[in-house]
UniProtKB/Swiss-Prot annotation:
The keyword Amino-acid biosynthesis does not apply. Involved in the binding of tRNA to the ribosomes. One of its GO terms (cellular component) is ribonucleoprotein complex. GO terms for biological process: translation. GO terms for molecular function: structural constituent of ribosome; tRNA binding. The keyword Zinc-finger does not apply. Keywords: Ribonucleoprotein, Ribosomal protein. This is Small ribosomal subunit protein uS10. It holds the Pfam family Ribosomal_S10. Part of the 30S ribosomal subunit.
Length: 103
């Protein structure tokens, strides 16, 4: 797999989970002899919701909620077959969305 790149994008609501998962991926890739670029923190997406507390009147009474989506990017340069096998067997946390692309 010479001159190839594996790009891994991670998304999670909890920044501790995503940092733990990126550390596992980087450690696994380095252990198998691949060159790693990252983890690169991408901009955090903040979704804000405003909800009326009162069912009828009192428009001034509101609650605001926020969901933050943290993202990371990891590039693995020149992966070996061993690297790909190790990454496929890697068990990551349940709250982390992983997208892998070959390029």
């Amino acid at each position: 797999m010479a001159n190839q790149r594996i790009r891994i994008r991670l998304k999670a609501f909890d920044h501790r989970l995503i940092d733990q998962s990126t550390a596992e991926i980087v450690e696994t890739a380095k252990r198998t002899g691949a060159q790693v670029r990252g983890p690169i923190p991408l901009p955090t997406r903040k979704e804000r919701f405003t909800v009326l507390i009162s069912p009828h009147v009192n428009k001034d009474a509101r609650d605001q909620y926020e969901i933050r989506t943290h993202k990371r990017l990891i590039d693995i340069m020149d992966p070996t077959d061993k690297t790909v096998d190790a990454l496929m067997r890697l068990d990551l946390a349940a709250g982390v969305d992983v997208q892998i692309s070959l390029g």
